[in-house]
């Protein structure tokens, strides 16, 4: 209807020419040359056909918004004198208030384009007022409320300042928050145009800290007041991830006037950092030059210059352009709808057509989101806002969400008092907040601002329990320390002198039977000299040290001796204890090992040591050392071949461990005396029993110059590490002796000279491997590493163990190797048993198969189970006999082997035919053959068919059979068949046979004997039974024959078997078909 009416009005042409005067009231000193924008808007409307001959606009421009409200007078003059029937503006809120109220009385429309006051949204007062400005107080309040609800906040505080402008804004925010269910928990009011220092000194920030975590800032001066307030917040330490600051941006200038830009446009990072962790709500193009470029291009494309325009008021120009378009479009729509050319005089009607209208604005074609103008239900522009997050320590502003209006249906804004739209929040970014998980802060602490929401009873009780536990732990520690001291004082390792007795050498040899046993070591004399018995039956070896003064053990000594007493490992010799402060001697006792020391083994030439012994001994020593190095004891300290004992299981047990350091200290204190055996110039390997040879060089050098030159003094202070590296050196010496049965020095070397060379740092004399052909090169390198002069370069005991096990192919101790050999033997034995068992099973299978060929399967199974098979009478079975015709003649002209070969060949074929047709061969006697079916397994009536099929196949086989040694002679047989009752059973125990008995057998035999060559003779009973159940067989009457013992009997010839097609043809013939 509207379209047709519009076309009709256009056709009127010259008949209806309406020219409306529109008055624009600008502002003195703002938006120069605003009439240029209005003229551009009018030209665009004319191009679009909105304005034309029937409807045109005349624009009158006047200035207002001065100090004396001259804009109000200008408005009255325009209406009464100049005939203006619509207003655009005034620019400022105060004058727009007066002009809009008069326009309501005059019933003419007013389009505001810069005023932002919330009061203009009341359409009960401003009935003909529409606004196209992007930012208004009430829309910003709606945007702030939508953002707050979107992030789940329900409690906020408002920060504002004194003054009418701020009061009006706060009132608008409070009303919207109340409508949206947002509770304003606190409102602070600052002095207008105050500074950051004054804000901090006012104490108001502390009030915010104690009442809110989400704060909305609604100041009269958006730029200046927010700048000072956020500086105060930052200096007060409240600008962090626990607070959210929401800044609704009412500034209408471009981003050149952002608060962190100076007067000359310079960027101020320190000011911007004050705005960190805040949300700035602005139109969707805020903090951007998005509108500037398309605005200039649009004006220049229309032939206008932008040089005389104020680009900082770009929003004002855009709104002014959109205001004229809104009015013209509304008038055109009104005229089209009413058909009355004077309808533009009805301001209320024109205002109604400004509601819910959407049209392109000045920059809508440039892809700018805010370029399109959408009016709500009370002719207010529905804005498109965005929330911008200001990240800390960054020069950018991040858009995190957009708030787009969505119009509501079934809503009348004139009744509800609002624009009938909702702001829909769309997230553009998440996880941006500088918290641990990126989540925004809650609107209040979990326990409230005064901890009123948390029950601390559990926490207090828990704290008391924790405190009690700590006290108990302290008490337990003190008590355990006391108990430990008591336990140390109890000295479980102490052995009183009266509790053991030493054994003389002769007595020991008698006890161990050394003299009579050839398997014992002959060099155990030194070992058995130090033997004792503790208690009644515990044999021990001991070391005796003369004691000069009483020994008082310190805590470290007591701990070490307790640890030695508690040490348990397969390759450690148990420490039995010590006897001290008695009889002026100190005795250290260890468990006795019956096979002596490894030194006795090495230097006994009667004993042969192969690689298995080498690997097992070295492995045991490394395992023992590895345990000591990883235990609390920490080291051995005096490793020598005679401190490696061999138990009765040929396992190495390390002895004398851990005691070297205390002995050295006690000797320096003058408490005991340690005796060192010096063998002088004795060069035999077995006599060089001196521990000094196994001491590393750093332990023997006693000159300060040598110590400082050869090693770092700080390392020497580390006693445990020093002792461990000394163990590695000593292990290298012992391993060389095990492998080569000699010390790692040239033959003929004097022991005393060796020790002197080692002590003297000016001469180089080190152990070396002289015969390197017998062992792996890597093992040689390992030995040399163990003897390295620098202790820090020597390998760890773990590396030594892994390398020796790898190079010597060690797989356990000697007992382990013997067990593996026994296990291998057992596995071989099991394999042999399995093979023999398999052979036995295979023989059993062959025997079972052979037995199954001699006897029926059922009978064979019963006999194998040891059960007897009773004779049984079968009511109906069929027996067949066969006989080779002329067999005697053939045998007379053949050798026995040829006869056997012939019979084996023909009977093998017969056996296959018998098995094929479910028959059983009872026996063969020479050339005679007895076959039965239905015995021993009954098969109903099938026995006659099985025998007939078998007989026919035997005849067929003989037609193609040739005697191997007589190709020209044809083999012929006679067959006889009879059906009847048969008795069967097993006869004999040694060679059991399954035999058939009864008249049926005799008759079958007579049928064979009276038959003719190459023919199958059947008795009357067999023929009748076959014809009754199986008519496919071709049987013809022979006549009467004389059977021995039976007299004359009637017999038949079995000629063959009809095929299925012949059977069908015969049946059809009988039916007459």
Curated annotation (Swiss-Prot):
Residues annotated as domain Protein kinase: 508-808
EC category name: lyase
Localisation: Cell membrane; Cell projection, Cilium
Catalytic function, reaction form: GTP = 3',5'-cyclic GMP + diphosphate
NADP as UniProt keyword: no
Signal peptide: 1-15
Coiled-coil zones: 813-844
Residues annotated as transmembrane: 459-479
Protein task: Guanylate cyclase involved in the production of the second messenger cGMP. Regulates thermotaxis responses in AFD sensory neurons. May regulate AFD neuronal activity such as calcium responses to temperature gradients.
This protein's domain notes: The protein kinase domain is predicted to be catalytically inactive.
Official protein name in the record: Receptor-type guanylate cyclase gcy-23
Native species: Caenorhabditis elegans
């Amino acid at each position: 209807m509207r379209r047709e009416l519009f076309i009709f009005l256009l056709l009127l042409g010259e008949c209806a020419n309406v020219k409306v005067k529109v008055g624009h009231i600008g502002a003195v000193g703002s938006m120069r040359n605003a009439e240029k924008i209005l003229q551009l808007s009018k030209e665009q409307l004319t191009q679009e056909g909105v304005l034309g001959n029937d409807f045109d606009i005349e624009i009158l421009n006047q200035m207002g918004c001065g100090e004396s409200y001259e804009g109000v007078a200008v408005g009255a003059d325009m209406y009464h004198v100049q005939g203006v029937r619509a207003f655009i503006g005034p620019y400022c809120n105060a004058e727009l208030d007066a002009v809009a109220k008069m326009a309501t009385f005059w019933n003419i429309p007013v389009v505001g384009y810069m005023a932002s006051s919330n009061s203009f949204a009341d359409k009960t007062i401003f009935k003909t007022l529409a606004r196209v400005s992007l930012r208004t107080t009430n829309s910003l309040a709606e945007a702030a409320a939508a953002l707050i609800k979107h992030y789940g906040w329900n409690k906020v505080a408002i920060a504002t300042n004194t003054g009418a402008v701020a009061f009006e804004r706060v009132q608008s925010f409070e009303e919207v928050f109340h409508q949206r269910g947002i509770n304003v928990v606190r409102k602070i009011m600052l002095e207008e145009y105050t500074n950051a220092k004054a804000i901090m000194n006012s104490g108001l920030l502390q009030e915010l800290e104690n009442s809110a975590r989400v704060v909305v800032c609604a100041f009269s001066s958006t730029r200046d007041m927010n700048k000072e307030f956020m500086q105060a917040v930052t200096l007060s330490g409240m600008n962090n991830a626990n607070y959210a600051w929401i800044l609704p941006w009412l500034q209408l200038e471009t981003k050149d006037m952002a608060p962190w830009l100076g007067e000359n446009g310079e960027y101020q990072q320190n000011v911007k950092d004050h705005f960190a962790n805040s949300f700035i709500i602005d139109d969707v193009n805020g903090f951007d030059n998005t509108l500037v470029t398309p605005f200039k291009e649009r004006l220049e494309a229309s032939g206008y210059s932008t040089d005389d325009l104020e680009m900082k008021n770009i929003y004002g120009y855009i709104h002014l352009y959109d205001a004229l378009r809104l009015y013209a479009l509304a008038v055109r729509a009104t005229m089209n709808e009413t058909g009355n050319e004077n309808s533009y005089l009805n301001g209320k009607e024109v205002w109604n057509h400004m509601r819910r209208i959407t049209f392109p604005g000045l920059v809508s074609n440039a892809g700018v989101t805010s370029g399109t103008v959408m009016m709500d239900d009370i002719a207010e522009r529905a804005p498109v806002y965005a929330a911008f997050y200001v990240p800390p320590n960054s020069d950018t502003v991040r858009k995190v969400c957009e708030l787009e209006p969505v119009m509501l249906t079934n809503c009348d804004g004139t009744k509800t008092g609002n624009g009938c739209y909702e702001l829909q929040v769309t997230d553009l970014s998440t996880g941006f907040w500088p918290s641990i998980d990126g989540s925004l802060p809650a609107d209040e602490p979990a326990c409230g601002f005064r901890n009123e929401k948390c029950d601390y009873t559990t926490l207090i009780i828990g704290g008391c329990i924790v405190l009690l536990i700590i006290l108990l732990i302290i008490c337990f520690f003190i008590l355990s320390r006391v108990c430990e001291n008591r336990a140390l004082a109890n000295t479980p390792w102490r052995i009183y002198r009266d509790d053991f007795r030493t054994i003389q050498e002769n007595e020991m040899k008698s006890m161990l039977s050394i003299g009579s046993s050839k398997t014992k070591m002959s060099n155990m004399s030194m070992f058995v000299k130090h033997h004792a018995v503790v208690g009644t039956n515990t044999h021990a070896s001991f070391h005796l040290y003369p004691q000069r003064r009483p020994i008082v053990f310190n805590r470290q000594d007591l701990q070490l001796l307790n640890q030695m007493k508690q040490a348990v490992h397969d390759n450690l010799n148990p420490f039995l204890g010590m006897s001290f402060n008695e009889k002026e001697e100190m005795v250290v006792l260890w468990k006795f090992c019956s096979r002596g020391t490894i030194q006795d083994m090495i230097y006994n030439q009667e004993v042969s040591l192969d690689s298995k012994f080498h690997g097992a001994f070295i492995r045991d020593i490394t395992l023992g050392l590895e345990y000591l190095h990883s235990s609390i004891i920490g080291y051995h300290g005096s490793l020598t071949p005679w401190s490696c004992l061999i138990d009765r299981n040929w396992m190495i047990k390390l002895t004398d461990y851990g005691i070297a350091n205390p002995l050295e200290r006690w000797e320096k204190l003058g408490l005991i005396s340690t005796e060192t055996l010096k063998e002088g110039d004795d060069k035999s390997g077995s006599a060089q029993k001196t521990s000094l040879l196994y001491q590393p060089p750093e332990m023997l050098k006693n000159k300060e110059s040598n110590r400082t030159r050869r090693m770092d003094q700080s390392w020497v202070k580390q006693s445990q590490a020093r002792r461990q590296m000394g163990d590695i050196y000593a292990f290298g010496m012992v391993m060389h002796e095990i492998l080569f049965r000699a010390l790692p020095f040239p033959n003929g070397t004097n022991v005393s000279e060796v020790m002197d060379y080692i002590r003297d740092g000016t001469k180089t004399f080190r152990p070396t491997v002289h015969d390197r052909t017998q062992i792996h090169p890597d093992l040689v390198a390992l030995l040399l590493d163990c003897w390295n002069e620098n202790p820090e370069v020597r390998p760890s005991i773990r590396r030594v163990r892994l390398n020796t096990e790898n190079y010597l192919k060690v797989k356990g101790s000697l007992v382990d190797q013997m067990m593996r050999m026994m296990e291998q033997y057992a596995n071989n034995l099991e394999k042999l048993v399995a093979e023999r068992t398999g052979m036995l099973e295979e023989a059993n299978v062959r025997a079972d198969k052979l037995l199954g060929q001699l006897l029926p399967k059922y009978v064979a199974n019963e006999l194998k189970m040891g059960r007897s098979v009773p004779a049984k009478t079968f009511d109906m079975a069929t027996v067949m006999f066969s006989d080779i015709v002329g067999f005697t003649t053939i045998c007379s002209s053949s050798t026995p082997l040829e006869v056997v070969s012939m019979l084996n060949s023909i009977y093998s074929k017969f056996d296959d035919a018998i098995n094929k047709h479910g028959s059983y061969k009872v026996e063969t006697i020479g050339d005679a053959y007895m076959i039965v079916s239905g015995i021993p397994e009954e098969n109903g009536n099938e026995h006659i068919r099985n025998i007939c099929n078998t007989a026919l196949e035997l005849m067929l086989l003989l037609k193609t059979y040739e005697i191997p040694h007589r190709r020209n002679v044809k083999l012929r047989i006679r067959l006889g068949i009879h059906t009847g009752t048969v008795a069967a059973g097993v006869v004999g125990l040694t060679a059991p046979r399954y035999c058939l008995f009864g008249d049926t057998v005799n008759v079958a035999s007579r049928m064979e004997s009276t038959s003719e060559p190459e023919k199958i003779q059947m008795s009357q009973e067999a023929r009748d039974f076959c014809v009754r159940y199986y008519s496919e067989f071709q049987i013809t009457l022979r006549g009467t024959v004389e059977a021995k013992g039976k007299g004359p009997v009637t017999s038949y010839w079995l000629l063959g078997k009809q095929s299925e097609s012949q059977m069908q043809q015969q049946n059809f013939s009988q039916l007459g078909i």
